[in-house]
Amino acid sequence: MPSSSALLCCLVFLAGVAASRDASTLSDSSCTQFPTSLPHMLRELRAAFSRVKTFFQMKDQLDSLLLTQSLLDDFKGYLGCQALSEMIQFYLEEVMPQAENHGPDIKEHVNSLGEKLKTLRLRLRRCHRFLPCENKSKAVEQVKRAFSKLQDRGVYKAMSEFDIFINYIETYVTTKMQK
């Protein structure tokens, strides 16, 4: 009987080692395939945003931009990683929860958009060369301050500019793939 327990224990251990190795290989292969899957992920983000774009852009009565050139400059520069990470977090934790409060249809589409953004963030984090961050972005802080000052209108402004954010993501990741 003790030998069958030892054998079972060894089999469980070997299965765990094999699963761990397969997961590592899967993660490595998903990182090598990330540059080719990125355009598809960005298309999905744009398609999900298109379902709420008109609603939020019609409600946005402000002429100023929330997502400015200084933010794009951070995305292109050495702060790109941090700017991207902070902006994803900003949209997921501050903007989208407020955006969901505009009816069940809007909530459903904003939820879908949020899930796609979470998937992108997860893929970026798995592939460390795309999201190895340390420093804070001043441009993101400016966006957050402007968003807060706008109060209720901030959600319309931030959501109406989500397509600009997708373009900034694309710029950041494209820059990283060229390095």
UniProtKB/Swiss-Prot annotation:
Residue pairs linked by disulfide bridges in the UniProt entry: C31-C127, C81-C133
InterPro entries reported in the protein's UniProt record: 4_helix_cytokine-like_core, IL-10, IL-10/19/20/24/26, IL-10_CS
Signal peptide: 1-19
Domain of life per record: Eukaryota
Pfam family of the protein (one): IL10
Family: Belongs to the IL-10 family.
Name the UniProt record assigns to this protein: Interleukin-10
Organism placement in taxonomy: Eukaryota, Metazoa, Chordata, Craniata, Vertebrata
